[in-house]
Amino acid sequence: MEKGRRVPVLLITGYLGSGKTTLLNKILNNRKGVRFAVIVNDIGEVNIDADLIAKDGLIGQGDDSLVALQNGCICCTLQMDLVNQLVGLMEGDRFDYIVIEASGICEPEPIAQTICSIPTMGPAAVRNGIPYLDCIVTVVDALRLQSEFGSGKSLTVKNYGEEDLENLVVQQIEFCNIVLLNKISEVSEEDRAMIKETIHALNPGAEIIECNYCDVDFSELLVTHRFDFGKTATSATWIREIEKEIECPPPHNHHDGGLLYTSDAADE
């Protein structure tokens, strides 16, 4: 293995049912000679997403190379499991790309922190190369955003609690490079405009790609070099507003008183 080898990682996030597994399957089916390793995380004891990938014919049931990170979340309880899998994938020149499908309840920022911390974990962690985060794609169900979140209006109201679904959806939109606006044909032009306006308000730096059934040009998602932790972490509108206040403080008055599945395209 050549020292200093770097392998790009695509992180796919999004709430349950948004289309993450559909996107993953389509990437694998259109790999065009790219050797992928895939890590799939499902919060339940049975990894439904991994089963769907197997059902799609990309892998066989009982394949020893199919390992799912399950019964936990890679943004918290399974962070070191994720590190160990990524480090293990760097052994041998077996693949060109790593795709991670996060659980629908995962917050993307802690996952990004975990991946980006691998180079600081000592020589053993990087002896075979370094997996680096290339891009975070959040898949958003346009119809659900329209029907359950008022075309996104409820996401811009900051009175929801930390454990509320709105908070999770907002975090997934705010901390990404690309928003894949899926099922777009199922909403009206008016709702589409409102949804895009909301997404842009939450994350002005994210590119919005409209699609149905996650049919996209995969060259827009792979080898993008889009991810920069500092820029992504400060792309959210509320953070930008705080930064503006710090840069331009108001006049001051004195007063008293936080699957692993390896696919070798050569076998096709």
Which residues are covered by each model-predicted region?
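Nucleotide-state-sensitive switch-loop elements of NTP-binding domains
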Residues: 2-11, 18, 22-167
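C-terminal accessory "lid"/substrate-recognition subdomains
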Residues: 157-263
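A short, hydrophobic C-terminal helix/tail in secreted or cell-surface proteins
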Residues: 264-268
